[in-house]
Amino acid sequence: MNSKQSQKNTLILLILLWISAISIFPYFLTNYIFSQDDLLFHRTRLDRYYQTVKHLDFFPRVFPTMGLNFGYGADLFYPSILLLPFAFFRIIGISFVPSYYLYQFLISFITAATSYYFLYAIKNKKKQALLFSCFYTLATYRLIDQSVRAALGETLAFAFLPLFILGVYTIFYTNQHRWKLLSVSMSLLIASHLITAFYSFILLIIFILLNWKKCKQAQIKSLIQSGALTIGLSAWFLFPYLEQTYHLTFNFANTTLWATGLNFSLSNLISNSLANVSAPFTELKPNIGLFLLVVVIIACFNYQKLTTNNKKITLATLCLILLATNIFPWAFFKVSVLATIQFPWRLLLFSSFFASLLATGLIEQFQLLSSRQVLMFIAISSFLTISFNVNNLMQSNSQNSITVTNKNYSDFYESEIGHGKEYLIKDTDFKKYFASPSPIIDGVSSSDSLNQADNKYNYSSYTLQTNGTQEVQLPKFYYKGYEVKDGQKVLSNYNKAGLVTVKLDNGIHNITVSYKKTVIQTVSLLFSTLLAGLLILQFLMKKKK
């Protein structure tokens, strides 16, 4: 690599770092995080995962102290492994708030890098790749996810969507079918945000149906290989998930579309985008932002002049925008598998991707790619981002929104387990249990002085006195995989009203409860780990050749 090329790459890296920093400016200058929408749930996930990593448990399945020590299966249904960088920041001594912003910066940088790689891999043009990276990483809907909704999983999904689409692109439009990339990216989407992974799969099916003529034997083979590899790489999550849902019915099985999504209109989207603000979550205004809205309008007015590719991208963007609003009859699917999206405006994630791609395509077609013009577009995006962030910070301040700080993060709303309590067994009366977090003996909450509890990281112990044979519901939310002991004797346990339940004979009992995980969890994790290791080894050996 010559000196000039090295300087260009260094400049690109610096710009990507700039984009990443701007995405969280000026939030990272504060010593607090505004508590909005999903923040309290993710605050708890982040802190509990940090605790499990300290005990070298990277796949905890159940966070034993989450939910007032009742133990919550967040990791069973919402994977935590990608939170590892945050845990590392905490372990090396960085406090909660700066660790949170460092983690957000890292996510933004990965998003900027993967989106740059996406377009560079297709076009082999650095300026276009840099512009797309800027538009996509600083897309307003991504900023809403990141800093207004605190939707950590969906923010992570933004980072891997470009790799997923690149994998699909290579299978259908090139001779080099990168089906392994498609598998890895889908596995990362699953590990990030299951809803986004599910809708990525739905959109892939729609794409295949629309492009069936391109689906020859080679494409079908690559898709099947990719699907099989995805199942293998994600077995550590998918099979334990299916195991739990086969035996138990959870609250998320009854998901319906929320009114805030069903009432979201196209006029709402346009006016919100023009305003360049989203407001705190109580007055959330989902949108794609002023810049991308202008891009879509320009593309529509100049549609006949556009290149074939830009016409296709325009149509894809418009379709996704309309799907995100109530122009599409979402009410028909209010109680269906499609209702897992909760809010149809979540599709603005995909709209933002294609609108950013459209913006880059228009700039290329209209030949606005001089170095000065490229820097001008980056400056415009940066300015709008700062404006958006500052406006939202100001509104949160003016409404005296609750804040999470380094002092209160661990004891602030300790019982928080998410808005919908999705990962509790259906009809679990968590409010009753939280009000009296003690064993329930034959349906009566125990208050006997002999009944004592001791909660450690990997087990909880209870000293109980029973009169005759009695049924005892322990203060632990039930998931398959618990082990209950009376002294050294392992007891059979089962679910009753959402709690781990056992039957005890007459006398005083020393009960210990620990989540030992299931055979399926252990074997599937081992399989996925070995498969991932083989893929990495194959990649490294290929690099050496």
Regions found by a protein language model. Give the residues of each.
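Compositionally biased, intrinsically disordered low-complexity regions enriched in proline and serine
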Residues: 19, 28, 33, 64-67, ...
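Transmembrane helical bundles and short interhelical boundary loops of multi-pass, membrane-embedded
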Residues: 324-326, 344-347, 370-451
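Generic signature of intrinsically disordered, low-complexity segments enriched in small/polar residues
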Residues: 2, 52, 81, 89, ...
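Membrane-embedded transmembrane-helix bundle of lipid-linked glycan/lipid transferases
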Residues: 1-395, 521-545
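Proline-rich low-complexity regions
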Residues: 60, 104, 162, 240, ...
